[in-house]
Amino acid sequence: MWVSGVSNYPLPCSSNFLRRFNGGREVGALGFRADTLETYRANEVESEAAKKKKVVIVGSGWPGLGAAHHLSKQGFDVTLLQATSCSGSLVTGQKNAAAPSSEIGIPGFRCPYHNIFCLIDELGIQPFTKWTKSAQYSPEGVEVETPIFQDLPRLPTPLGALFYPLFPHLPSVDRLTSVPLLSAVIDFDNTDVAWRKYDMMTARELFKQLGCSERLYRNALNPLLLVGLFAPGEQCSSAATLGMLSYFFAHQQDFDVVYCRGVVGEKIFKPWMESIKMNGCRFLENRKVTDFLLDGTTGNILEVVCGNEKFLADSVVLALGISDLQQIIMNSSVLQMREEFLNVLNLRAIDVVTVRLWLDRKVKIPKASNTCSGFNDSMGWAFFDLTLLHDEYKDEPGTVIEADFYHANQFLPLKDEVIVGKVKSYLARCINEFEVAAVVDQVVVRFPKSVTHFFPGSYKYMLRGSTGFSNLFMAGDWIITRHGSWSQEKAYVTGLEAANRVIDYLGEGKFARIIAVEEDEPHVQALRSLGRNINDLRTQSQSTILTFIFFEEKSVSSVHIQ
């Protein structure tokens, strides 16, 4: 110990100290060769590292980086394993020999993404556009024009969403049929009871039961599901639908959106990963997890296996999408031991196809962000003017468009040229100027089974943040959480929740601060409280009636016996 104490002080370089040489190497006055002192220092560093608890995170993107971000700041020895050589799932760049870098999917960042915006402030970066107006198209033209809600006088929920957007083809009488939907949104409080109550029913059935008009469903509600839950209403869980609606429409401004001014992987993930690396986290690429080894005494995960490599772990976080986790489960004898992981094999994911087009001229597009429906019964899509959204395309001589297609299984087998032809035809039906513009370059990227499908009945197969292995935790946008957020914000929050579970399990470090979803407006809280009281009274009444019937039958039986 005294040697390590000496090595913490600056060593003098005078001839009195370096007065002897041995084999051409300097030897200090204490009798230690300089290289020996360096060895002591290295051993001391290794000893300190060995004392740190080891956490292995599998998967990057918002959940994996979120967990790594906090745990590395708490001094844990964190290793993040990536199956590929690029991080960020659907939001990193793709290189194509015929075109500049192309991004897979253009994610929006909604007003209630408070935890993500807090992270951006912490990183000291400015990756976002200003708040952006949007439009929704059908083959008949513009169906909805959405303003920036926070710029308008605030109305009680849901009045702002009903009256501020422009609905050229949707009469007020149809819009008003959505009001009964508020009762279901209020009844859905994101508890386990609420999810199980609504999950088996399709969104289409729910809207029909509540009296929503067919035109409202066709022109507004179903298009929202196609780009929000990536599937048509008859294939969406009504519980997931209510969860999404209650998050994005709880307050007038919640649907406002900004976009990244470039590839998310470059603008956000790259500086974020550099920050995490500075905290000591290791990023290892091209490491596909094949199995786990268990501690024979505790039954906990002892090592993460990647082919011939093994990584010791005091705790493990799986921050993966459904398809990636299913692949691991299919290979892992350890995960196959648990029913909860076998249940994951019942879940499904949705295909995405993204198309980026470089046009030979400028096309005037009223809104930079646009969603579309009605061109295909089961497929939703969105298109974006990247010359307005992305910095790198501002000086392009022609317009650069990205079109992202969800539930795009019908596009997967088609050749690129066929897909591009269809996309160009769809765009021309939205905006006439696309018809005369020529495509000078293109990138088509297919992502089969890449986003979560919240189908009716899926809730019972989904995992919670904690698992049957006491040191194995989950994160991702499909993991059950009571936070109430959605999409990227939910993915990031579950990463922080996983980090907090690791800290709680290992008994070290400070918990991550997670910003709660903003409280409901007072009238919504009052209605929700009233609904709970009515449900409680209904339950008590049913219990009283059943008790009365039981004692009546018992009394009658006693009389017969006598």
PLM regions and their residue ranges:
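Dinucleotide-binding Rossmann-like beta1-alpha1 core, especially the glycine-rich loop
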Residues: 98-194
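Conserved Rossmann-like nucleotide-cofactor binding loop
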Residues: 63, 86, 323
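Glycine-rich FAD pyrophosphate-binding loop
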Residues: 72-96
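N-terminal Rossmann-like FAD-binding beta1-loop-alpha1 element of flavoenzymes
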Residues: 50-80
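Active-site/ligand-binding neighborhood in enzyme catalytic cores
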Residues: 50-51, 177-303, 307, 312
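Extreme N-terminal leader/targeting segments of oxidoreductases
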Residues: 2-55, 73-74, 521-562
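C-terminal segments that line or cap access tunnels to active or ligand-binding sites in enzymes
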Residues: 250, 254-257, 302-305, 313-315, ...
